[in-house]
Amino acid sequence: MLVLFETSAGFALFKVLDEGKMKSKPVDINNFFETPEKASSFVSLKKFYKFDGTLDALEAQTAIAECKVPESLSNFLKKNVVSEKLNEQLIVSDSKFGNAIKDALNIKVLCDDTTQELIRGIRLQLKSLVNANEQDLNAMSIGLSHSYSRYKLKFSPDKVDTMIVQAISLLDDLTTEINIYAMRAREWYGWHFPELGKLITNHTQYANAIKAMGNRKSAVDTDFTDILPEEVAEEVKEAAQISMGTEISPEDLDHIFALCDQFLSIQAYHTELTEYLKSRMEAIAPNLTILVGEIVGARLICRAGSLMNLAKYPASTIQILGAEKALFRALKTKHNTPKYGLIYNAKIVGEASLKNKGKMSRVLAAKAALSARFDALCEVSDTSYGIAYKGAVDRRAAAIEGREVRKSLNAVKPEKSGNVAKYDHTKSATTNTTRDVATKSSKESSIKQEKQDVKMEEASSSDSDSSSDSDSSEEEKSKKSKKSKKEETPVAKEEKKEKKSKKEETPVAKEEKKEKEEKKEKKDKKEKKEEKEDKKEEKKEKKDKKEKTEETPVAKEEKKEKKEKKEEKEEKKDKKEKKEKKEEKEEKKEKKEKKSSSKEDKKEKEEKKEKKSSSKEDKKRKDRDEEPEEKKSKKSKK
């Protein structure tokens, strides 16, 4: 067995002296490398290949990291293993690297738990086994590690984007915390001075005013010149004298001051972080920041994962980036897909009118894709592309917003008037289709006319031949119809009787229909009422969300109660529907039974009628038979 060991100085090829020890457990192999003497008795150095320099070592290390066999190692193994025609197995530290050696040089490779313990023992006693100086090995390892780290950083631009990704995610977290702390301070201090919240809308001004004023009684003596404008300060002083709030203890004020201090510190760090993010975006993606802005650009990079991934995306994905849920929901329900995602927060899209926001987002996404590619792949950072694209997008926005009617062949001619009508994109979109339909209809009408002319000519030529045949066929048809009327089967008679009985039962059927319609109307009314109640509840929930950004424990309990009520309503609905279905089934069964009973009664009546008719016929026959006998008796008497 041979062992391949990679070091920073070169490749070492060891030979296992006692292969029987390899069959022992992996834990026992550590005992064979406790001392240099034991290690030399178990493993011996066969050959060692030394690197020419750090460049040679770096090439070999990069190839091994990519699971490729470097040329230096392949030549080394060919000389010492393949040329000597050794059928021994080669022990390797990595299984993937071993498969690469097996494919390239056709050498048997081994890698398992015992081999890993063997390589660990060789690494422990490497100095004694190779007979190398410790300082030289350390110097080679440090040089190789520095050069390899430089190589990895040079060819991985994704590592630089992590600063932007982490900064924008932290900025979003800070904004949520700031809103939570501000609302908490307003609710807490609102018990003491509720009028202050309506007078001061800015959160930072509100917190500074609380810190400066403290208790509302001292509002008259406090100076708000550095915090608030003069008009607002006077209103605050007047409101403090007529406030409806409750009294507050000094301990409560201390806790409110601590909350305000924490809020102001987070706010200050938020501003510092935005400045840091702006500087990083200008350094890493200057063209994208000019076009979209630093915050929107950072969010796009964060959503894509890195600037390189964003550069690989087409303009269509950049346009919808951030609206993946809405996109998949639209595809699932077969509705219209969203027109914009995170790019909606850009300044250019926000300034556009509501009708043209989709067009502006598409134009901006196209230029943003190009600017991201320049930022990711250009060696020299230059803002010329971003400035040029910004001007092009601004011109396009001006053209879209203040656009006149385009002169085209497909467009509908406008009416003659003094004022020029604005361009309507909805009409122009349908002009091509209407024109195509008109041309198709004209072509189809001409083709139909030609076909009709041909048919008429053929019919006129064949009229003289088929006149006699048509007369004879009509006579035969009339005879057959008369025969069929005369020869009506008993089955046809029964069908006629059933139809008559159905006509007689019309009032009952009408009453049943009326009952069904009344039930349907009641159901519809109930459903409409329930839908209205659900809509009212949804509106109330939306209002509560707008008023309060954070959910208090009371609000959570209310939500739970609402959910439970909804579930109870749904269960009641299900039970009602099941009951209604059962009632409908029972009604159907009763109707079927009634119909079957009515049919049986009819059959009995018909049978009685038939018996009566048959009895009458028998009497008539008897009377007929008796008459000639009486006549004969009279003649005999005469």
Swiss-Prot record:
UniProt keyword annotation of ATP-binding present: no
Source domain of life? Eukaryota
- What residue spans carry the Basic and acidic residues bias annotation? 437-458, 485-521, 527-574, 580-632
Gene3D superfamilies recorded: 1.10.287.4070, Nop domain (1.10.246.90)
Q: Which UniProt keywords apply?
A: Nucleus, Ribosome biogenesis
GO biological process terms, semicolon-separated: ribosome biogenesis
User: Which portions of the sequence form the region Disordered?
Assistant: 416-638
Instruction: List cellular component terms (GO).
Output: box C/D methylation guide snoRNP complex; nucleolus; small-subunit processome
A Pfam match is: NOP5NT
Q: Which family does it belong to?
A: Belongs to the NOP5/NOP56 family.
Q: What does this protein do?
A: Involved in the biogenesis of box C/D snoRNAs. Part of the small subunit (SSU) processome, first precursor of the small eukaryotic ribosomal subunit. Could function in the small subunit (SSU) processome, first precursor of the small eukaryotic ribosomal subunit. During the assembly of the SSU processome in the nucleolus, many ribosome biogenesis factors, an RNA chaperone and ribosomal proteins associate with the nascent pre-rRNA and work in concert to generate RNA folding, modifications, rearrangements and cleavage as well as targeted degradation of pre-ribosomal RNA by the RNA exosome.
What is the protein name for this chain? Nucleolar protein 58
Origin species:
Dictyostelium discoideum (Social amoeba)
- Protein encoded by which gene: nop58
